[in-house]
């Protein structure tokens, strides 16, 4: 089986309503399946929300009661992994027969993580926690470790996620290429014109399919209770999308789209990967391990280790 159809979902969550967002996600999964998709990618922080324009009312050297409450409200929208929400998503993946990458805000103890969840028709198959929150994201998200760099096997090759500006970390990309990634999923909150160029570069560099999804987010899709430092105009666009699919030779086969909520699809052929690797394999015949070598630590890093 070499040919398949991929989908990238461009949409926004329902503000302050996890149950409604899960329901919307399931409906979008069904819509992607109805359009013949075998694989679908959702944006970064789709479930739980990307706090675009928020700063939790923080100041250097001081926090405020208002900001603490904003964070508590935001945390309430995060999900446990695994949990009841992942069970619902797993059931939807099973019924649709889809392989999925979905961006969520994961709650683990007192810390939130920006996480990509992997689902197969058999259920929840793994996750990747964002290693490096960008800029002010560090106000609300913790740092993942190397233990969640796994990929998931599909009938069309291995699928994995690199989240937003992790894609600008050359060693992170190389680690994924070393795993033989075929379906390189890039959930993002970056809606700039330059993002499409980044996705094309990665497809060429890794000789893989790149599937990137970004939210189409307006102010009214953003929680009213959370202060927004960009705008309070309800129809103002905070994230304009830019969903895109690129083949292993860097050719754009769908998108980028900035028109609103949508699902883009493309028919792909995994035989394009060996054809592209004929003249370039970044971790194979085009590598120089005698000169350059990457060491990846995938051991979990726990703050408390108990030994008997």
Swiss-Prot record:
One of its GO terms (molecular function) is nitrile hydratase activity. Keywords: Hydrolase, Plasmid. It is an enzyme of class 3 (hydrolase). Its EC number is 3.5.5.1. The gene is nit. PANTHER family: CN HYDROLASE DOMAIN-CONTAINING PROTEIN (PTHR46044:SF1), NITRILASE (PTHR46044). This is Aliphatic nitrilase. Nitrilase that hydrolyzes preferentially phenylacetonitrile, but not (R,S)-mandelonitrile. Also acts on dinitriles like phenylenediacetonitriles (PDAs) 1,2-PDA, 1,3-PDA, and 1,4-PDA, and cyanophenyl acetonitriles (CPAs) 2-CPA and 4-CPA, but with lower activities. Residues 4-270 form the CN hydrolase domain. The active site is at residues 44, 130, 164. It catalyses: a nitrile + 2 H2O = a carboxylate + NH4(+). Belongs to the carbon-nitrogen hydrolase superfamily. Nitrilase family. One of its GO terms (biological process) is detoxification of nitrogen compound. PROSITE patterns: CN_HYDROLASE, NITRIL_CHT_2.
């Amino acid at each position: 089986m070499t040919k398949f159809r991929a989908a990238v979902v461009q949409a926004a969550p329902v503000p302050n309503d996890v149950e409604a967002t899960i329901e919307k996600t399931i409906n979008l999964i069904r819509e992607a399946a109805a359009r013949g998709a075998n694989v679908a990618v959702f944006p970064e922080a789709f479930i739980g929300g990307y706090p675009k324009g928020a700063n939790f009312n923080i100041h250097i050297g001081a926090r405020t009661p208002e900001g603490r409450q904003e964070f508590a409200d935001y945390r309430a929208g995060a999900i446990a992994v695994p949990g009841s929400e992942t069970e619902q998503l797993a059931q939807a993946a099973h019924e649709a027969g889809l392989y999925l990458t979905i961006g969520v805000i994961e709650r683990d103890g007192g810390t939130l993580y920006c996480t990509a969840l992997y689902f197969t028709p058999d259920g929840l198959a793994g996750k990747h926690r964002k290693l490096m929150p960008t800029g002010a994201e560090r106000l609300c998200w913790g740092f993942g470790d190397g233990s969640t760099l796994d990929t998931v096997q599909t009938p069309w090759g291995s699928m994995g996620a690199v989240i937003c500006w992790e894609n600008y970390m050359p060693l992170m990309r190389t680690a994924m290429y070393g795993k033989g990634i075929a379906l390189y999923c890039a959930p993002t909150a970056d809606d700039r014109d330059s993002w499409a160029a980044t996705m094309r570069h990665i497809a060429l560099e890794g000789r893989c399919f790149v599937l990137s999804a970004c939210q189409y987010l307006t102010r009214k899709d953003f929680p009213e209770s959370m202060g927004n430092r960009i705008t309070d105009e309800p129809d103002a666009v905070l994230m304009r999308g830019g969903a895109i699919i690129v083949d292993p030779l860097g050719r754009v086969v769908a998108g980028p789209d900035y028109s609103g909520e949508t699902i883009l699809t493309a028919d792909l052929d995994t035989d394009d990967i060996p054809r592209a690797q004929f003249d370039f394999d970044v971790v194979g015949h085009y590598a120089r391990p005698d000169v350059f070598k990457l060491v990846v630590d995938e051991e979990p890093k726990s703050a408390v280790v108990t030994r008997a």
